[in-house]
Regions:
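Non-catalytic signal-transmission and effector/linker regions of two-component phosphorelay proteins
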Residues: 1-11, 42, 106-120
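Charged docking surfaces used in two-component/phosphorelay signaling
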Residues: 21-25
Length: 120
């Protein structure tokens, strides 16, 4: 059995508490350590310094966009996927080529996205 230190660490930026709790459980069951942030400031703090391997970023975090977090992750070479209920045309053009999990998504879609990030 893996110890927490051996598990890939994922930053989960999600402001909907119930969804965040469900995702945290699903991710932990799939073998990830999870660092959660529901607000942009906390997400930025974790993105800048935490030892994370990948991230799921809700685009809208309590009325603030997570694009600054994505810039930090990109600078650190940490892969990420956006999670959004927005239609593609509502995502700024500069970010449309990034991986986007369209809400609602299922376990299969989540696992495929995360596997793709880890293999990239």
């Amino acid at each position: 059995m893996s110890t927490d230190e051996n598990m890939p660490c994922i930053l989960l930026a999600e402001d909907e508490m119930l969804l965040a709790m469900m995702l945290e459980d699903r991710l932990h069951t799939s073998g990830y350590r999870v660092l959660k942030a529901a607000r942009l400031a906390k997400c930025m703090e974790l993105a800048e310094s935490a030892p994370i391997d990948l991230a799921i970023l809700d685009i809208n975090l309590a009325g603030e966009v997570s694009f600054p977090v994505a810039l930090v992750l990109r600078r650190r070479g940490i892969p990420f996927v956006f999670s959004s209920g927005y239609d593609e045309q509502d995502v700024p053009e500069a970010w449309r080529n990034e991986n986007i999990l369209q809400k609602p998504y299922d376990s299969r879609q989540l696992n495929a996205a995360l596997t793709g990030l880890l293999e990239a």
